[in-house]
């Protein structure tokens, strides 16, 4: 396994739905007399960049250099998003403003480490081809020096069929690794990429299977691998870990390494960032999946949108509690 220090040499493009994660932190002491709902006493508020921006933040935390591409609305929230990004470790980003569009915001009310409610503000219509061309031009100018491309699809309208097809072709023509966190039931949109990282429900629904059915992971994994001809497929399964499928190989399951699960918000972002960075650094699919699994186990133990860091991951690996899972680390 390549050392985590090798991540600092990586340059990775992230294209996807950028959003603002807003948290209202408080406490609940009573039920409202007006309706059977809790009354939250607001104690604190915080803002963090989410969605594709959280993928980029995880890459930066790992020491890689992310190049983030996304869109925002022509509203005050878009200005807030720019301000949050400017204060983050993401130093290279192009967030294109689109007239008449709302900046995607997810507002979460949290009390006693529990989500009380989430409020979404968004525009989900696909962007125009003209807007897509602006992004594609910027991407084409730097892609020669890039090690990998991550596509983070939250189905908020950025990744139109036009943009997706052109982006995949551009990356593959340059022989870049393309890793996708997919959305929706039609995974054929991602044909031509190297790897996708859906969760169990997404994989099952894309294969027209019941997510709760027996061996939904195995059946959907084999179906997706066959139809898309991927190099690999990593299906995340929450508290049950994740399963890696590779072309011509038996599925490889990894049990979750999480000691406590407080919040799964952004865990998929951590998985794809770590997995893609590990692949770009020269690791094989199994070692990359092991690192992604370890990173996910760390972040789900924290409340709110959070990111992995190289030091946190290194400390986790150095403890030796899971040495049997990382024999190749010292090979």
Q: PLM features: what roles do these ranges have?
A:
Residues 145-158:
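Short acidic, glycine-rich surface-loop motifs adjacent to enzyme active sites
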